[in-house]
């Protein structure tokens, strides 16, 4: 199906372009979201009549997104999650979780705007891209940790996936790797085996 784009759509084209897309993509996404019109003569005339209005609306949305991007760019957000000693999360941090975190901080971000290839499954610092507008993209840092104290330590550059990093000096000496029993070591005990 051929459609006329009413705004810039990534990987398709700019506003006003006539592009050929699959029927399902047009029917289920582009047309209901108001991002495109079917490419026929009546709609082409309608688009040309509204072009200036659409461009002004697009420019207004872009300037609003740019203002939010200035406030958001480079900011760091902390997500506290439970995780194992190796840093593996019990669960994951998805686009929905990130959107809720940003909304709680006062930024209006939809989960569809967060560009994340796969959910985050380990603790640490992660850069996340957010598309506030098709032409405005911003990157924020997500600090995923077990506690707020750990998040501060991670922000300073510490790696928190070892037992010493997690427990500090409180770790039991017998739990240190060098004190583990080695079954291949020579036994030099006081007992004689006959």
UniProtKB/Swiss-Prot annotation:
RNA-binding as UniProt keyword: yes
InterPro entries: Ribosomal_bL9, Ribosomal_bL9/RNase_H1_N, Ribosomal_bL9_bac/chp, Ribosomal_bL9_C, Ribosomal_bL9_C_sf, Ribosomal_bL9_N, Ribosomal_bL9_N_sf
Domain of life where this protein originates: Bacteria
GO molecular function, one term: structural constituent of ribosome
Disordered: annotated segments: 169-194
Listed GO biological process terms: translation
Entry keywords, A to Z: Ribonucleoprotein, Ribosomal protein, RNA-binding, rRNA-binding
One cellular-component annotation, GO: ribonucleoprotein complex
Described purpose of this protein according to its UniProt entry: Binds to the 23S rRNA.
Cited PANTHER family: 50S RIBOSOMAL PROTEIN L9
Name of this chain's protein: Large ribosomal subunit protein bL9
Name of the coding gene: rplI
